[in-house]
Amino acid sequence: MFLIASTLGYAQEWVGVDKSTPVKIQETLVSSSEEEIIVDVKVGGFFQTSVETPNGKQVVISADNMAAMLTKGAPELPMYPISMIIGDRAEMEVSIVKSNYTDFENIEVAPSKGNFSRQINPADVEFVYGEMYEQDAFYPASQATLDSPYILRDFRAQNLMVYPYAYNPVTKTLRVYTDLRISVKKVSDNGENQKVSRRSDAIKLNVESKAAYERRFINFANQSKYDFLVDEGEMLIICVDEYMDAIQPLVEWKNISGRPTTMVGVSETGTNDAMKTYVQNYYNEHPNFTYLLLVGEYNNLPPYTMSYSVKSDNYYGMLEGDDYYEEVLVGRLSVVSSQDATNQVNKILYYEKEIDETATWLSRAVGVAADEGAGHYGEPDYVHMDYIRDTLMHYTITEMSQHYAYVNNPTAANMITDFNAGASVTNYTNHGSPDGWAVANFSNTHVHQLTNDQKLSFIWSVACNNGQLDYQECFAEAWMRATNEATGEPTGAVGGMFSWISQPWQPPMYGQDEMNAILTEWREGYKHTLGGVSLNGNMFVLDMCPEDAGETHNSW
């Protein structure tokens, strides 16, 4: 056993089975066929973070690239999802073929506080010990389960949920399964959430979609029974009629640049259920339909009400199955006038057609967070942001600012100066409201003071309510509508991810990590779209956080 204390500003300690340095979970595909998929999983240890509980000092267990189970009252342990393609109708079952484990004695593992909003201070949430703390048994009892099957455009898939750690609260024993061989075997053609039809004999996908499948599915390379054809993917724009003339230059550019694009008015599609039916029919008739852009605001092109708290544009892209994974990637330009529509179109056209790719500001990034929380892996928000900073600075970013409340205490003036210098990407993690960020009380007012003419950032914001479109002008809308009144040039942002709901602490942090990871992966001849990076990263939340029940994903 090896112990290593973290060099970060919070008390995290590595406990290794046979390695003195932290090692990440390893997954290996052994074999894959229609009948059976076999996977090997290896784990080399765990991190433990000390916490104060009603029973004294206990520890939270975590591991890189894994997710907390978030079951309130159960031992706080990591789990790991492995996404795999399965048959269109198959019912699968999972079994452990073989395993090895190491036991660690005299460890007291704290219970999970569960999944809750960032409006709640984690320190104010009491530890509750569930019934499993009274049982002389290891929790969880199984080291592998199967989540519900889902359909993601061309494939039906299922997440293999791996639990390499098990805890017996009575004997105070943490069991680490260092080696697992897991079989996922077909048992019938009576599976739930079946993919009942295919729209064409061949699978047409663009380079970005192919890369997303390769990243997501452990057995994508084994799908030899399908014919794959390269295709750019079609875009459908649904626009409030009075803005269609202003949006037409974007339609023309998309078609010229190789992405077949069609625009229709809301008078033709309707809204809410009628629009969903229109999009569904369009999807059924156009096998290459990949992107949906909505142009309008809450009052004339509303998001879909999925629940009391969740309003969703993503819903319009959920076109197969009874799951939340989108077949079509959905974005929005929230505009209030033709002039506003023209301004936002000009942002996109400049970014895609005219930007100087050698401009030094493109190698800059902005990070905004605070010394608050314990989010995923027990990290305070600013530590989470430092990890993102490290990821970006191993890519093409050479400078990333660190605006951290309760660390270096930035002001709104500091942040305005930073944004005015230009930044290609901005990450925010902390508290928010419909009209701003909590850090430095940076609000709509400050966004409209920016003079970053055509030096526009793309923003991934982990915060409450920044994208609440029924607000008179929400924070997301301010970033997209901003203009320098003196020059007439677009300012603010070129796009972003902002949530409708009061986001929880942990689930969106996994999504934000994945967005930055996708952005920075290197592939020969491969260019990302910011929409593809963002929405594929958002779907990762569904994999990592089943306890969240889709709320983060659907409303972001």
Q: What role is predicted for each listed range?
A:
Residues 1-13, 549-551:
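Bacterial Sec-dependent N-terminal signal peptides
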Residues 10-268, 273-291:
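Extracellular pro-sequences of secreted precursors
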Residues 163-165, 238-242, 264-269, 294-298, ...:
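Active-site-proximal beta-strand/loop segments in catalytic clefts of secreted hydrolases
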Residues 231-235, 256-262, 286-291, 355-366, ...:
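Loop/turn elements at helix/coil->beta-strand transitions in domains of secreted/extracellular proteins
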Residues 235-263, 326-413:
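A domain-level signal for caspase-like cysteine endopeptidase catalytic cores
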Residues 279-308, 371-373, 377-473:
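Catalytic-core segments of thiol-dependent peptidases
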Residues 299, 369, 467-556:
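Active-site-proximal C-terminal subdomain of hydrolase catalytic domains
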Residues 314, 318-352, 357, 434-511:
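Catalytic cores of nucleophile-dependent amide-cleaving enzymes
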